[in-house]
Amino acid sequence: MRKKPELLIPASSLEVLKIAVVFGADAVYIGGEAFGLRAKAKNFSMEDMREGIAFAHEHGVKVYVTANILAHNKDLPQAREYFQELKEIKPDALIISDPGIYMIAQEICPEIERHISTQANNTNYGTYLFWWNQGAKRVVSARELSLEEIREIRSHIPEEMEIETFIHGAMCISYSGRCLLSNFFTGRDANQGACTHPCRWKYSVVEETRPGEYMPVYENERGTYIFNSKDLCMIGHMEDILSSGIDSLKIEGRMKTALYVATVARTYRKAIDDCLEDPEKYRKNMPWYQEQIRSCTYRQFTTGFFYGKPDETSQIYDNNTYEKGYTYLGIVWEVEDGVCRIEQRNKFSLGETIEIMKPDGRNQEVTVERIVNEEGKDQESAPHPQQILYVTLSQAPEKYDILRRKEN
């Protein structure tokens, strides 16, 4: 096996970046306020990016910045300004899909590594070699590749070149995410970061000789969702993943909550480390990994293209809803004399049993004993989103612990 692969975790905001770092990421990928493909994510201002990169580097974690839109002419002057700013704050790499954007990055900040986004349709070793010859350090493989194809790519490219591969998260119905459904239905360009996810909508069928007659396609009483993929999950196949020559194991989810990011980062961190230490230990701990992964929001799971082309079992035809095991209550930002300061994310109440989720894998059940607002007034509950609260629990948490509540 090559060197220990990197665990690469998404972050939608500065607070989520800090959680990703603390809960086990080797590297974090983020988007700025321009040129990423997640316009609906909070994204990072330059100041947040600067702070996030400093925090990550203090903990020995790398930060990659996405600049992976498919650019139009109007984007190129702004790209030059953007890369000048990034040059000063020194991220560890830029993730790029567009050759025009790539050339600008290469000109302005050649000292920053350039990684080629999955949006560039990287499906063969010839493509990898092309980008290597252009100076790219790493290529993100298309989700449409099997493990066998990835191994073949590894055998044809330079030893120093890196392969990054998605191993967990949402799957796009379109080839390497290059979808036009959002453009067609809403005028919002998925390749400019504004996807409205029409693949998750409910559809009917029209027969061409009966225009205007919309016939529902039923899988159950709620209709059918013919483009709706299950989520990718390779937690049960780490032995195959770790022997395939992949250098970076990437988690999708740059619009996910801190709870989701913490759960997935912590679980894959332990699975990777256990598998490398002792495959038998990894197999023995499989029920714990599966339980933890299913504790955050997901859409049912598939192994995607890793073992061949997906069939109908990789789709969800009867609903577009997430499964949900826990509700996210907040992050512990400070603890003093047993009282923790949090920013509330969902309602909780006095006397309620909740869980403290810790980076080391432990989960502690605790009781909410007191809730005090910033004015020093006691509250019976915490109903207001993003309210700053001072909470006393039956056991004191630690900084960066996450509070959550198990759902039935």
Regions picked out by a protein language model, each given a short descriptive name:
Residues C109:
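Conserved phosphotransfer cores of two-component systems
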Residues R38-F55:
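Glycine-rich, positively charged N-terminal anion/phosphate-binding segment
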Residues G100-I101:
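Alpha-helix capping/helix-boundary segments
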Residues V65-T66, I96, I116-T118:
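Short beta-strand elements of ligand-binding domains
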Residues M1-A11, V16-V22, A27-A34, G52-I53, ...:
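Surface-exposed amphipathic alpha-helical tracts and adjacent flexible/coil segments at the periphery
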